[in-house]
Amino acid sequence: THVLEQYMTYPNGAILQDRFSESVLQTIIDVAPKVLKDPTDYNAASNFMWSCTMALNGLIQKGVPTDWAVHAMGHELTALFGIDHARTLAIVAPSHYKFNFETKKEKLAQYGERVWNITEGSTDDKAHAAIEKTVAFFHDLGIDTKLSDYTQNYEGTAEEIAQRFTDRGWLGLGEHQTLSPDKVEKIVKMSY
């Protein structure tokens, strides 16, 4: 999701930046299952690691809006439950996209078309299908996407994270800086 946080906002005319992100995502979709099947597959592993480098070296975020709210929520799940970073992002991201659907649907549909080859349906249909394809991909990799898959002690987690954000003064996350702690609470609850 490190790529998605620098991509999944709204269309802003940064064609090359979008294509960089989309190519990284397509490469990960192609090679991640191969790496899991055979970690000694040097070609797959090297392409996977190069994709990881591109996800975090700062290139794909240049000149585009970013949304690191999924990261902020995911880090809290790691702190509270010891769930590894990638898994917490897979827990939060689908709920984040569903909660913020109206502001993200254009980019979600673009992602669906360009990364997942979803060509049928309306913008809304493509956007919803893209979220579902992403969840299915996580599952194919053996990554669960609900907090309840990792712990039975999840009740109250959303409220605790919202309070932590309030205490830190994190009152407006996301690309529009409108994701308040009460909205974070709703997203985390959707992730149960």
Give the ranges of each region predicted by the language model.
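Conserved anion/nucleotide-ligand pocket segment
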Residues: 1
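Active-site segments that bind and position negatively charged phosphate/pyrophosphate groups
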Residues: 6-133
